[in-house]
Amino acid sequence: MNKENASKLWKIIQEAGDYLVGQLPDHPNHPKGRNPYAHVAICVKSKFNASYKDIPDELYNEVIKYIEFLKENPS
């Protein structure tokens, strides 16, 4: 992904993390609470098999749609 798109995507990931603070369900592996920023980044990496910086530019809009899905469906 080009630098400009990667930067925009990182900002969107951070905003999604802000939105998800306190919304993720409890998990026994995270007794002090879950990190919503890491959750979004890990979900993106898992779905697209690459770090957000390494996803092709052609998938930029698809990544944004997926992040919106994560916000609507905290898990």
Residue ranges of model-derived segments:
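Positively charged, phosphate-engaging catalytic surfaces used for nucleic-acid and nucleotide handling
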Residues: 1-75
